[in-house]
């Protein structure tokens, strides 16, 4: 039997990314392209590749960007994914690219602006991203 409080957990978004995925960095922190190397909090089966979706925090390594940012291991929030996911009202949402925003440990964005749209699911879970986002879809 499922407890009533168990239903209040976050909404499940279809995961369109995994460890090893290259993603676009959509803020002005200095990074351009990053690779996902971990998903904090994921406890899965042995040898299963951890998945990530919109609104999830991931650990990335910066592959392209300014010399200060390159080869750094930082945290990021997934704000867009190509894989379509369904919202509770029945609409399907898919973006043109897979994109992340680099953040600190507590979820504060490192950059001062976010280019392009940001999924509403990411803003609901990480409100500080919504303060810097130009468009929330």
Curated annotation (Swiss-Prot):
Superkingdom of this protein's organism: Archaea
GO biological process, one term: translation
Intrachain S-S bonds: none
N-terminal signal peptide: none
GO cellular component, one term: cytosolic large ribosomal subunit
Pfam families: Ribosomal_L14
Molecular function GO labels: large ribosomal subunit rRNA binding; structural constituent of ribosome
Keyword RNA-binding part of the UniProt annotation: yes
Keywords recorded for this protein, A-Z: Ribonucleoprotein, Ribosomal protein, RNA-binding, rRNA-binding
Subunit-structure text: Part of the 50S ribosomal subunit. Forms a cluster with proteins L3 and L24e, part of which may contact the 16S rRNA in 2 intersubunit bridges.
Family as reported in the entry's similarity comment: Belongs to the universal ribosomal protein uL14 family.
Known role: Binds to 23S rRNA. Forms part of two intersubunit bridges in the 70S ribosome.
Protein name: Large ribosomal subunit protein uL14
